[in-house]
Amino acid sequence: MKLRIGILGTRGIPNHYGGFEHISEYVSAGLVKRGHAVTVYNSHNHPYTASEWNGVTIKHCYDPEYLIGTAGQFVYDMNCLLDARKQNFDVVLLMGYTSSSVWGKIYPKNSTIITNMDGLEWKRTKYSKRVQQFLKYAEKLAVKYSHYYISDSMVIRSYLAEKYAINSQYIPYGADVFTEVEREQLDHAEALNEDYFLLMARMEPENNIEAILEGFNSSNSKRKFKVLGDTGNRFGKYITNRFNNDDRIQFKGSIFDNTKVRALQNNSYLYFHGHSVGGTNPSLLEAMASEALIAAHDNPFNKSVLSGDAFYFSNAAGVKDLVENVQRKDMEKLMVSNNLHKIQYQFNWEKVIDGYESFILECYDNLNYERIITGQR
């Protein structure tokens, strides 16, 4: 069965922003290769202006976020939904709910609505108490107005089952292992030096960037610490100002060249992953696929992916201890190998696309059967 599928809730593809854009890029192209007609909604501000990408139809909708800030996200999602109502999609896949679930009453009436439930957005410390309360409400609305649900983490799946008594489908993100060509392109001279630590994240408090850099700053390490991520926001400016006296810390900004990012991950002595909120994080999977040795913030999300194949820290003191004491020996090599095995057999993109396709087909069949039985269609 070939379906008409609309993917909403992202800023658009190809990815220039984050996790949902990343997975939408892979899943949409993968579904097209399997014969489905897929449309992805893009912000009109997206740098990719064509109406087609790798067989995926691109629909640009007006997005005033650049004019009015966060409120613009709600307007953008409303515009996407209003257009989707005209398209006669068999399935609408909503990537997240923070600014779309308030429009639940205008979700396309005859489409099967599937929502990827994101990663406990209301826990993010960057939000005020009022915003956190709204996000809890938005989560509740997403449960109410969706027919089916996807969780990208078993932790999220368990939370939704306990909180709302709903059964969501676990489908994680994916990552690609090195191709032979990519492996040949790695800078082996730099790899042999292994003279730097690495962190890649959005500059947000819940990513524990301050604790990581504070721990490194207080250490006696002679290595450099490279930080990848846009430092243009308020927190990013605070972080760069706080640590600008440490010549070992290098803020590299955002790097969108995936080959370069993967080489940096692969060549690092130790890769720090500080994310503490959310489901399966794409940058963590990419670090695993890039064969980096990983030190992760100690929380259920990271442990559900890495289990015993990483070092863990909870605060700056823990970071300092890792910076000063981690050695690259046989046990560490086994950690890297085990994580690569997880990418190959658990978090590979073909398996992820398989999961999305089979779940979408199952949901469409089930809902239409129910509608026939109840006389709704």
Describe each region flagged by the PLM:
Residues 72-85, 89-117, 279:
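An aromatic- and histidine-rich active-site surface loop
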Residues 82-85, 131-149, 158:
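Membrane-proximal helix-turn-helix segments that form the acceptor-binding/catalytic region
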Residues 6, 188-207, 213-220, 225-226:
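Conserved donor-binding/catalytic core segment of Leloir-type glycosyltransferases
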Residues 275-276:
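Aromatic "clamp/platform" in nucleotide-sugar-dependent glycosyltransferases that forms part
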Residues 2-3, 10-16, 30-68, 155-157, ...:
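N-terminal strand-loop element at the rim of the active site
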Residues 270, 289-296:
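Short hydrophobic beta-strand element within catalytic cores of glycosyltransferases
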Residues 46, 200, 223-237, 250-255:
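Glycosyltransferase donor-sugar binding loop
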